[in-house]
Amino acid sequence: MMNKNKKLMVMAGGTGGHVFPGLAVAKQLQQQGWQIRWLGTADRMEAELVPKHGIEIDFIQVKGLRGQGLMRLLKAPFQIVNAILQARRHLLAYQPDAVLGMGGYVSGPGGIAAWLMGIPVVLHEQNAVAGLTNQWLAKIARRVFQAFPGAFADAPVVGNPVRQDVVQLAAPEQRFATRNGAIRILVMGGSQGARILNQTLPAVMAALGEGYEIRHQAGKNSQQDVAEAYAAAGVESAQVTEFIDDVADAYAWADLLICRSGALTVSEVSAAGVGAIFIPFMHKDRQQALNADHLVACGAAKMIEQPDLSVEKLTQMVRELDRAQLLSMAQKARQAAKLDADKVVAQAIIAITE
């Protein structure tokens, strides 16, 4: 059924973990005739990324409050009210039938403005621990979804919306069927890279010796330094890039992934069907570690928390994984995947606007 006159405003920004899932839901609704517009901030990645996907974007001025000085905190109430008023102006101009909050600072003012105007709010929490913005918005949202158990007590667990090129990868047993020789390791630290991975992996690869290939996504402005670190460690064959444009192709190539455990990364690893060693980013609420827990528990992944990370420990963990174990991990990852989150969230939006 087509919904040619229906409009959605997506509210998401800051990181790919918020923006890419929002784009996946938007694409589902566009295929059913919906018009999509975005609410974001002008100085974060959505400003450049969203228009590349053919979606117009409006901007508000808003920043986070965590870790700010006293003057910022004193000004915060006025800045929040101003951001809500800015969001309200954009909502009045666009007149959406619903708004979708995917997290990031922009979701708070946008969601409150929509609620005050009587526009239905649908919320999706990507992490196993709900962010402050989504904790607030969950109290006023018409529907709330979570990617992993634990963010909310009674919200449906639907996984994270994942890009279709990742979902459509061949099954692990097909990809691994003809592989022999060097084990392929893919290192990913997110769009900004991960300093701890950049510092540790060259020494790990040197210690592993022959029998391994590596592709390493170093992050913004780190490619040269990381490439030089591999060369200094005697690892001449490392392929180091700043950013990976075709993530699906990289997952398809890999036998093993070594990475952070941001929400979208964990969901993509599972959807792709690749075994992983997660090195969670250190945070007081252990958000990234909790994101990865379910894949570790089912045997699809291993985890080393950052305080426990050493060259020796990671080297030993990689050495212990042979091809049979890597295939088993990949299969368990794919079996644990929830592949229809974008469809479930899109259908909920359609249902509340009928």
Swiss-Prot record:
Compartments reported by the entry: Cell inner membrane
Family matches, as PANTHER family: GLYCOSYLTRANSFERASE, UDP-N-ACETYLGLUCOSAMINE--N-ACETYLMURAMYL-(PENTAPEPTIDE) PYROPHOSPHORYL-UNDECAPRENOL N-ACETYLGLUCOSAMINE TRANSFERASE 1
Gene Ontology biological process: carbohydrate metabolic process; cell division; cell wall organization; lipid glycosylation; peptidoglycan biosynthetic process; regulation of cell shape
CDD domains: GT28_MurG (cd03785)
Membrane topology annotation: Peripheral membrane protein
Protein species of origin: Vibrio cholerae serotype O1 (strain ATCC 39541 / Classical Ogawa 395 / O395)
Protein name from the UniProt record: UDP-N-acetylglucosamine--N-acetylmuramyl-(pentapeptide) pyrophosphoryl-undecaprenol N-acetylglucosamine transferase
Lineage of the species this protein comes from: Bacteria, Pseudomonadati, Pseudomonadota, Gammaproteobacteria, Vibrionales
One Gene Ontology CC term in the entry: plasma membrane
Binding site for UDP-N-acetyl-alpha-D-glucosamine: T15, G16, G17, N127, R163, S191, I244, A263, L264, T265, V266, S267, E268, Q288
EC number: 2.4.1.227
